[in-house]
Amino acid sequence: GTRMKIIFVRHGEPDYRELEERFYTGFGMDLAPLSEKGRQQAQELCQNPLLGSADILVSSAVTRALETAFYVSCATGLPLRVEPLLHEWQVLESGVENFEKARTLFLENNGKLLPHCPIQYETAEEMRARFIESMAKYSDYQKVVVVTHRMLIRQFVPNETIDFCQVIECEIEI
């Protein structure tokens, strides 16, 4: 494998109101744009000098990530690639309560899915594999900015909490 320098960026704050009012669920919620505050976070993010040191910008296809990446691309001039497999952690039952319940189970069980678990979700191992598979095609690049989601980023960095538009540098074996 190759070691790849990755600059993780979590997307800005999204605004789900319009979709919630229309009872969208699952991937439908991923259509949510950034909120006013989220756009501000994305603009402030662009002042981070680390971003300009990368060779390419890769984003999750999910709107909140892609909109964040658009600001970074405009500010840095980095070429932007969209990767559909960099989406957020998958919980098979939809709804915010299930997501939070699943998250608690995921953390309690160290990212494993125990047999007879009431909620089915993606394991830590599956998430890591999906990320690495998705990033393999960028192995020729020295340093890559990746705009993606909290649970996915957490599989590679020790940070307990990751704020909107937080930047975290790390090295990963691809």
Mark where each language-model region is:
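Phosphate-handling substructures
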Residues: 18-19, 28-33, 74-130
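Active-site-proximal alpha-helix that buttresses catalytic centers in soluble enzyme cores
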Residues: 5-81, 166-168
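Acidic, low-complexity terminal tails and accessory targeting/binding regions
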Residues: 3-5, 48, 81, 85-103, ...
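Short amphipathic alpha-helical/adjacent loop interface patches that line ligand
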Residues: 42, 131-132, 150
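Generic beta-sheet signal
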Residues: 6, 55, 140-150
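A short, acidic, amphipathic alpha-helical segment used as a generic capping/interface helix at domain edges
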Residues: 127-139
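Short, active-site-adjacent cap segments at secondary-structure transitions
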Residues: 15, 65-66, 89, 152-154
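Short, well-ordered beta-to-alpha junction loops that form the rim of enzyme active sites
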Residues: 59-63, 85, 147-151
